């Protein structure tokens, strides 16, 4: 299953090859996805290659071949002209399922450990735990990892988050790092820097410049199932 970034890049490459017969340059791909550096494109291409969606052709410049597209792939309108794209951890790129009152969309998995590429596909809905203010926009993610165990968040839990791009120091948030990797951590502001702090001494606090971290949601509730 592809992340939104991977799918966006795959469709961009596929469209460009169809139009021109040549795959786009790394600079063109970086611009199309609005990434800060080409290293992010390298990682996305490697991930697509490992998953069997593309391959690199030897001894040819700008040589990428699209081997397949996801079954659900529907190229977004004006994909080649999009310059306002911003990473969105929880934006569903396909048709949305009908919303049911009292239900919250489950949009994928989130790392409570080392950052991982978040899955950008709606996986159903979960019942609202109740007590949440009406009128706010919520989403749910399944937790992978144990970096937040001392905050009471365990591997396999489902976290409910309020969709927001702002947070106070000390809030537990979904953070997007460099527009690619997502993690669930406690946010601390240290001067001009942003620290993503685990609640497990086995994990180090990671510190970034403010332009490298984008808050996607703030933790408001947790659901745990006992088998």
Swiss-Prot record:
GO biological process: DNA repair; DNA replication; negative regulation of DNA-templated transcription; proteolysis; SOS response
Catalytic reaction annotation: Hydrolysis of Ala-|-Gly bond in repressor LexA
Name of the protein in question: LexA repressor
Function: Represses a number of genes involved in the response to DNA damage (SOS response), including recA and lexA. In the presence of single-stranded DNA, RecA interacts with LexA causing an autocatalytic cleavage which disrupts the DNA-binding part of LexA, leading to derepression of the SOS regulon and eventually DNA repair.
Family: Belongs to the peptidase S24 family.
Classification via NCBIfam families: lexA
Pfam families per record: LexA_DNA_bind (PF01726), Peptidase_S24 (PF00717)
Keywords for the protein's UniProt record, in alphabetical order: Autocatalytic cleavage, DNA damage, DNA repair, DNA replication, DNA-binding, Hydrolase, Repressor, SOS response, Transcription, Transcription regulation
InterPro entries in the record: LexA (IPR006200), LexA-like (IPR039418), LexA/Signal_pep-like_sf (IPR036286), LexA_DNA-bd_dom (IPR006199), LexA_repressor (IPR050077), Peptidase_S24_LexA (IPR006197), Peptidase_S24_S26A/B/C (IPR015927), WH-like_DNA-bd_sf (IPR036388)
GO molecular function: DNA binding; serine-type endopeptidase activity
Organism in which the protein naturally occurs: Hyphomonas neptunium (strain ATCC 15444)
Site (Cleavage): 112-113
Entry superkingdom: Bacteria
Active-site positions on this chain: 147 (for autocatalytic cleavage activity), 185 (for autocatalytic cleavage activity)
Subunit structure: Homodimer.
EC number from the UniProt entry: 3.4.21.88
DNA-binding annotation, residue ranges on this chain: 26-46
Family annotation (HAMAP family): LexA
CDD domains in UniProt: S24_LexA-like
């Amino acid at each position: 299953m592809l992340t939104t970034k991977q799918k966006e890049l795959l469709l961009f490459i596929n469209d460009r090859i169809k139009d021109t017969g040549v795959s786009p340059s790394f600079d063109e791909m970086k611009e199309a996805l609005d990434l800060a550096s080409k290293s992010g494109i390298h990682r996305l291409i490697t991930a697509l290659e490992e998953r069997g969606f593309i391959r690199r052709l030897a001894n040819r410049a700008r040589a990428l071949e699209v081997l397949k597209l996801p079954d659900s792939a529907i190229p977004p309108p004006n994909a080649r002209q999009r310059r306002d794209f911003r990473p969105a951890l929880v934006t569903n790129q396909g048709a949305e399922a009908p919303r049911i009152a009292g239900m919250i969309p489950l949009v994928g998995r989130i790392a409570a450990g080392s950052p991982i590429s978040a899955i950008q596909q709606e996986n159903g809905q979960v019942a609202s735990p109740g007590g949440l203010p009406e009128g706010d926009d919520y989403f749910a993610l399944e937790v992978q990892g144990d970096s937040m165990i001392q905050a009471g968040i365990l591997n396999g839990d489902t976290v409910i988050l309020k969709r927001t791009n702002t947070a106070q120091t000390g809030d537990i948030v979904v953070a997007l790092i460099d527009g690619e990797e997502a993690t669930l951590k406690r946010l601390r502001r240290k001067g001009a820097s942003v620290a993503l702090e685990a609640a497990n001494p086995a994990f180090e606090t990671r510190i970034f410049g403010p332009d490298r971290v984008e808050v996607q949601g703030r933790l408001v509730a947790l659901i745990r199932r006992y088998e």
